[in-house]
Design a protein with these regions (language model features):
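Short, low-complexity, charge-dense intrinsically disordered segments
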Residues: 1-11, 21
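Bacterial N-terminal signal peptides
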Residues: 26-35
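Boundary at the C-terminal end of the N-terminal hydrophobic targeting segment
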Residues: 39-44
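N-terminal targeting signals for Sec/Tat export/insertion, comprising classic cleavable signal peptides
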Residues: 48-77, 81, 188
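Primarily the HKD phosphodiesterase
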Residues: 67, 71-128
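Structural recognition of the beta-strand scaffold that forms the well-ordered cores
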Residues: 77-80, 103-107, 130-131, 144, ...
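Solvent-exposed loop/turn segments at secondary-structure junctions
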Residues: 82-86, 108-112, 135-137, 149, ...
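Signature of lipid phosphatidyltransferase scaffolds
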Residues: 146, 150-212
């Protein structure tokens, strides 16, 4: 729903003479138009499908992600701030081995400065990876499974794809299934981020994911 925004003019103190009031009014009108235009881009998605709700450390969110990835038939799209979980990394490798197209977007700074990332190992196995460099923090934690299918899934929440998110942190995770309009919106946003990200050049790795 688009809500009209009325420009609010500043309060002028008694005895103060405003310079160029026409220009100031124009600025506020332009600002109001920009707000309305931005709201016009918002799109409500009808509720449908099912929702699996998990809270760590009590629920097995990591296991739920691994099981969902195991059911992927043709595509998995990942947006990761952190991806250090070996079970999740192995599930992505297994998916690729059975012919599923797996593609990953990752935060550049965390990959550069962090430890135990699964990204080098995944890239070395042939999974395409792009690094997000445009933003201060690429903080999305999203997985899209068979996003163009009627029974596809969106995985999202505060949950990073890490051991700590499962065992030490208080996190939430949603697995939303069977909402094609929502899946398409997430996939469109994923592709928008990929278009401005930088391809990751895979480096040789040891079996444990470290550099030789």
């Amino acid at each position: 729903m688009i809500v009209p925004v009325s420009p609010v003019l500043p309060v002028v103190q008694k005895g103060f003479r405003m310079q160029h009031p026409g220009k100031l009014l124009g600025i506020f009108l332009l600002f109001g138009c920009l707000v309305i235009a931005s709201a016009a881009k918002a799109e409500a998605v009808p509720a449908s499908g099912t929702m699996e709700v998990l809270f760590t450390p009590w629920d097995d969110a990591e296991g739920a992600i691994v099981r969902a990835l195991a059911k992927a038939r043709h595509s998995i799209h990942v947006q990761a701030y952190l991806l250090t979980s070996r079970p999740i990394g192995n599930a992505l490798l297994d998916a690729r081995a059975r012919g599923v197209v797996v593609e990953i977007l990752a935060d550049y700074a965390l990959l550069k400065n962090g430890q135990n990332s699964q990204i080098p190992q995944l890239a070395a196995a042939g999974i395409p990876v792009w690094l997000e460099t445009r933003y201060a923090v690429a903080h999305n934690k999203i997985m899209l499974i068979d996003a163009t299918d009627a029974d596809g899934a969106v995985i999202t929440g505060s949950y990073n794809f890490t051991w700590s998110a499962q065992a030490r942190n208080a996190e939430n995770l949603l697995i939303l299934r069977g909402n094609r309009p929502m899946q398409r919106r997430y996939l469109s946003n994923w592709r928008r981020h990929r278009a401005e990200a930088q391809p990751y050049a895979a480096q040789p790795t040891n079996a444990d994911g470290t550099s030789p």
